Amino acid sequence: MQKNLDSLLENLRAEIDALDNELSDLLDKRLEIALKIALIKQKSPIYCPKREREILKRLSQRDFKHLNGEILTGFYTEVFKISRKFQENALKELKK
């Protein structure tokens, strides 16, 4: 019985690991695009609250099985922070 549970747990964790790999690949691609945006907007502010609100609104209108507004907002708030910091650092490096 315990061996079956351990095997099931191992399989589920392998699925999570695969999803984590996909998520990190997607985040890396998102940052690549964010860098392109930062280069275009060099003279403009990086922070665009209107755009962030639009993204959150669009995502909150999607139908998810388990994601709710609180989870989406929390997750994307962190994604936005990471993206802004990445853009800021990239632009600082260009100015050196």
Where are these regions (language model features)?
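Domain-level signature for soluble enzymes in the chorismate/prephenate branch of the shikimate pathway
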Residues: M1-K96
